[in-house]
Amino acid sequence: MEKIEHSTIATNGINMHVASAGSGPAVLFLHGFPELWYSWRHQLLYLSSLGYRAIAPDLRGFGDTDAPPSPSSYTAHHIVGDLVGLLDQLGVDQVFLVGDWGAMMAWYFCLFRPDRVKALVNLSVHFTPRNPAISPLDGFRLMLGDDFYVCKFQEPGVAEADFGSVDTATMFKKFLTMRDPRPPIIPNGFRSLATPEALPSWLTEEDIDYFAAKFAKTGFTGGFNYYRAIDLTWELTAPWSGSEIKVPTKFIVGDLDLVYHFPGVKEYIHGGGFKKDVPFLEEVVVMEGAAHFINQEKADEINSLIYDFIKQF
């Protein structure tokens, strides 16, 4: 990874660790949970080789970026504020945006600041229009029960104890290799997930060690705080109820992705609802045999799918 440079940028009251490579039009990558800039290692090298400036920060609460202690510091407004400040510090006016659970924040970025986005490639997590009648957590509890993982992440200390009950490397092996497409309803926590006997070809012990070393140092609370701020973000986004995402968009999802199998999601994506809420949605790609972490699992295909879209602009 000798071509990847690392820096620390002051933005929005925090210090943000940023990995970047190349020069040219900027592509900003937003990682998911429980991940880091490192999840985009393949894309950074590929797009930088094609004449792009590829930028992948550790988001607030992750890796070598500051982690404010309060869950209320992890709303979409905070995260998008961090990213706008980052672009300002880097002297970048507009970016191509790419996200996974970063996808959640990428949708909000496009909702709040479409002027800063040339085009969007989002992976795994579809746009969810704000429902003014029910908060996200109440909706999840109603639909999937209290043992749904987002609900289990809410009480401070409980999820931390679950993730701390096995060594960090083992937890990453469990998490990154999940292939059960059913929504994670986990009465006994993520520690109850199966540990693979061997790693898949796309994931090395070195990769696991990188994630594990960072999270062993920081813990997982920063990541959990995104989930703990979901309802606060919902409250604060009331002015955007009914707003559309008006950015050219490509959406990519694996057919084994757990989010793709949430109740009603396939119907929303393929039945016209998604296109109504994202009117400049140009393409939906469903990748056969791929699960949630497709930017790592199917790196070459994802690289090509991203490039084929952004090169048009």
From Swiss-Prot:
Binding site for an epoxide: 149
Reported tissue expression: Highly expressed in fruits 15 days after anthesis (15-DAA).
Keyword Kinase: no
Catalytic reaction(s) noted: an epoxide + H2O = an ethanediol; (24S)-24,25-epoxycucurbitadienol + H2O = (24R)-24,25-dihydroxycucurbitadienol
Annotated positions for site Contributes to the formation of an oxyanion binding site for the epoxide oxygen of substrate: 149, 227
Pfam families: Abhydrolase_1
Name of the protein this chain belongs to: Epoxide hydrolase 1
Organism field: Siraitia grosvenorii (Monk's fruit)
